[in-house]
């Protein structure tokens, strides 16, 4: 029989009609001779009633065989429920079954198919096809589909061209580790799965496409966390002849459309702008969460000269004030915060509390001479807790920024209903890598430096600024972009600044440099992490909740057992040998 509609869409207007439904048995109950079935499909749950006095003995026998997650087909008459269930969209109606067919049986599931089920993450991933049956998960993917639909419509209306770029590309340095794919035809050579379509989308601008977009899979072999996966999806944009502001206007319009169509929220445009330096110095992060205060305070000058060498001899002394919550933190709690601070390079964590109008705590005696000035600068009040970090400016900022976020979550200071977007601009072009012992690109080596700082490519790289911009949402980097280099001479200078010899630059990026000989237009773009965006819209804490078949924290798939061993024949075809490291 043909299905009449989704079970979750049956409403009062269907009362008096005969319909056919198909789906899964969510629950079966036997009450007073009647059998009640909760039938679940993609759109929700519908109650079925099987009355032995109104159906054949075959139907009754079939109904008695039903168990959870059996797949069934039913025909029946829609009636009003005697006792409505206002927790269900279908709660005003029920289906009196006249015909019933079992389409497939099911074993007992390893966990109950319902929201808020207590089960390990690996078990959820091992049986992901069951996990995805849960209504909460289905809603996540409906939201994701609405987001991508909204984005495509918006960009199509602005005459962006959707172009697919290669999945098998060339491995290049300056980024995360590549996933490599050995070539059977060119033995000893490898493709790389793209970390982004960065260079190919730039080449599309050289081809005259003017406006490109793609919702594209990307791959990075990096350590995983809650908002990262080895394969992820980004909304990738590139434009020709547009300014930084014009590109940002397009992106803001796209996000405003998504927010309106998926959350019914009118966001205020334009988004606030904050320089990288302000973000780091005031929030301790290049992706600041602006939903709460607790800004970092610079006390380096204030404490200069006091009789406490930890402060007076430190390159920087900064603090955050936890307003009105000192009594929430015992010595043991502060010790835990100290251990947390050490993860970010801090040697320790100094602290004082405001108790009975005076500073109290391990370092209070060293602050007596500046207590009035300190209290005024920090606007201290009774029951405030002050946390200090004395170290390099970088360590102080990073440590207090992390503490700020942790404490705000611990004290439930964040309004979870808010969506605070902002642009972080005026980025440094390079960042120092202790591991590499050299400067590396803060974004990528194709970013255009500001005209005022470009001369420092041959001087102090720390002074080079980039025409780059990140879009931030609630403390997460939603995406990043920049204007790109389109002049060959500037691109060669950039490669040289990064330590490439001319031969190395030509070997890795010769095709791009050659393209710059043929009228490369000014261009720029941006990429937004789609998984992360949907995660935040759905109010989830991990992007696994919005990716259909994600990997676990070991970059493995417990369901398919990927990655897996391959046969010796496959390795021989590729001229590969596996060395044991036992």
From Swiss-Prot:
Example GO molecular function: catalytic activity, acting on a protein
Residues where L-aspartate binds: 174, 220, 443, 484
Region feature (Aspartate): 198-201
Keywords per UniProt: Aminoacyl-tRNA synthetase, ATP-binding, Cytoplasm, Ligase, Nucleotide-binding, Protein biosynthesis
Pfam families linked: GAD (PF02938), tRNA-synt_2 (PF00152), tRNA_anti-codon (PF01336)
Catalysed conversion reaction: tRNA(Asp) + L-aspartate + ATP = L-aspartyl-tRNA(Asp) + AMP + diphosphate
Residues involved in ATP binding: 220-222, 229, 477, 529-532
EC assignment: 6.1.1.12
Major enzyme class: ligase
Domain of life, source organism: Bacteria
GO cellular component: cytoplasm
Gene3D superfamilies referenced in this protein's UniProt entry, alphabetically: Bira Bifunctional Protein, Domain 2, GAD-like domain, Nucleic acid-binding proteins
InterPro entries, A to Z: Aa-tRNA-synt_II (IPR004364), aa-tRNA-synth_II (IPR006195), aa-tRNA-synth_II/BPL/LPL (IPR045864), Asp-tRNA-ligase_1 (IPR004524), Asp-tRNA-ligase_1_N (IPR047089), Asp/Asn-tRNA-synth_IIb (IPR002312), AspRS_core (IPR047090), GAD-like_sf (IPR004115)
Protein location: Cytoplasm
Biological-process GO terms, alphabetical: aspartyl-tRNA aminoacylation
SUPFAM superfamilies membership: Class II aaRS and biotin synthetases, GAD domain-like, Nucleic acid-binding proteins
Summary of the function given for this chain in its UniProt record: Catalyzes the attachment of L-aspartate to tRNA(Asp) in a two-step reaction: L-aspartate is first activated by ATP to form Asp-AMP and then transferred to the acceptor end of tRNA(Asp).
SUBUNIT field: Homodimer.
Family, per entry: Belongs to the class-II aminoacyl-tRNA synthetase family. Type 1 subfamily.
Name under which the protein is recorded: Aspartate--tRNA ligase
Organism: Streptococcus pyogenes serotype M28 (strain MGAS6180)
Source lineage: Bacteria, Bacillati, Bacillota, Bacilli, Lactobacillales
Gene: aspS
